[in-house]
């Protein structure tokens, strides 16, 4: 079983970014995109999802779309964050922490 997790942190005030809608899309080799799962960050700004990955799933690309426009109520430039990645090991834990602000973001791959 694979695990995908993320932690969204608000760089403006140092809090956890709770209530942010997150969509994980799967993109197959033909470029066809489908929603793999949807969720929302919890009070701690986190998402966590366990799932089975088939061999075909491991050959796909994925994108995590974080809908940040509603989270920041003032004027902002970044309305959503899109991170593209792969999950090639069906038994691995994938962790994508993101520091967000109204006008920028920073991400790293954590294992």
Language model segments and positions:
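Compositionally biased low-complexity segments at domain edges in trafficked proteins
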Residues: 94-111
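Beta-strand-dominated extracellular/periplasmic modules and repeats
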Residues: 2-88, 93-97
């Amino acid at each position: 079983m694979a695990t995908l997790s993320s932690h969204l942190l608000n760089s403006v005030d140092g809090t956890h970014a709770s209530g942010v809608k997150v969509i994980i899309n799967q993109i197959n080799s033909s470029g066809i995109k489908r929603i793999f799962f949807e969720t929302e960050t919890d009070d701690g700004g986190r998402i966590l999802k366990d799932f089975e990955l088939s061999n075909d799933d491991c050959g796909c690309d994925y994108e995590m779309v974080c809908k940040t426009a509603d989270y920041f109520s003032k004027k902002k430039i970044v309305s959503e964050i899109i991170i593209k990645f792969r999950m090639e090991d069906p038994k691995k834990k994938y962790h994508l922490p993101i520091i967000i602000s109204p006008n920028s973001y920073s991400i790293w791959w954590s294992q």
